[in-house]
Curated annotation (Swiss-Prot):
The keyword Membrane does not apply. SUPFAM superfamilies: Ribosomal protein L20. Belongs to the bacterial ribosomal protein bL20 family. GO terms for biological process: ribosomal large subunit assembly; translation. PROSITE patterns: RIBOSOMAL_L20. Binds directly to 23S ribosomal RNA and is necessary for the in vitro assembly process of the 50S ribosomal subunit. It is not involved in the protein synthesizing functions of that subunit. GO terms for cellular component: ribonucleoprotein complex; ribosome. GO terms for molecular function: rRNA binding; structural constituent of ribosome. Keywords: Ribonucleoprotein, Ribosomal protein, RNA-binding, rRNA-binding. NCBIfam families: rplT_bact. This is Large ribosomal subunit protein bL20.
């Protein structure tokens, strides 16, 4: 006697048809066609989970660029000015500010414009009434940047001696705080030897 997989087969096929709900034509009725379309849909979903990140980044950059040009500065100069000023806002937040709170965005753009036009870019200062809080790498507490003060003077010094577990940047920060000269191309082992 031939055994037919009635219940199991029906359940399996109904599950696939349920996944194909809303498709046009035979793609939501016929099991064979529905199965192919569901598999193709999974491929589209996988691909577009990657693409949506790119698309949103493009959208944020377009919004920031439009708002920054209203303030007389290009997108690239704005981002460079933020980097020099030590303003760590991501593109998502900047785009949200550009759309919902243009006055604050304008103040930030003015700060960036001053940083770009300043002849010495190293000693950058914030002279707006916006307080920005960020956490320095290796710092014990957040560094608060206040108007009119240099970002260099507010950095927290690394107190403890670096160990082999410390990063090269932390070791260099320690050597800088102790005023120890070191070659810029020095390896981690050479820097640790200078610490001792």
């Amino acid at each position: 006697m031939r055994v037919k997989g009635t219940n199991v087969t029906r359940i399996r096929r109904k599950k696939m048809i349920k996944l194909a709900k809303g498709y046009r034509g035979q793609r939501h009725i016929n099991f064979k066609v529905a199965k192919q379309q569901v598999w193709k849909s999974y491929l589209y979903a996988y691909r577009d989970r990657k693409n949506v990140k790119r698309d949103y980044r493009k959208l944020w950059i377009a919004r920031i660029n439009a708002a920054s040009r209203k303030n007389g500065i290009s997108y690239s100069q704005l981002m460079h000015g933020f980097k020099v000023a030590g303003i760590d806002l991501n593109r998502k937040m900047l785009a949200e500010l550009a759309v919902s709170d243009f006055a604050t965005f304008s103040k930030l753009a003015e700060t960036a414009k001053k940083q770009v036009s300043a002849p010495t870019r190293k000693a950058a200062t914030l002279d707006t009434d916006i307080k920005i809080e960020r956490i320095e790498k290796g710092a014990a507490k957040p560094v608060v940047l206040e108007p009119g003060k240099s970002t260099k003077t507010q950095e927290v010094a690394v107190a403890e001696k670096p160990t082999t577990a410390s990063t090269v940047a932390e070791i260099k920060a320690y050597l800088d705080s102790e005023s120890i000269k070191y070659p810029s191309s020095a390896k981690k082992a050479d820097l640790l030897a200078l610490v001792k």
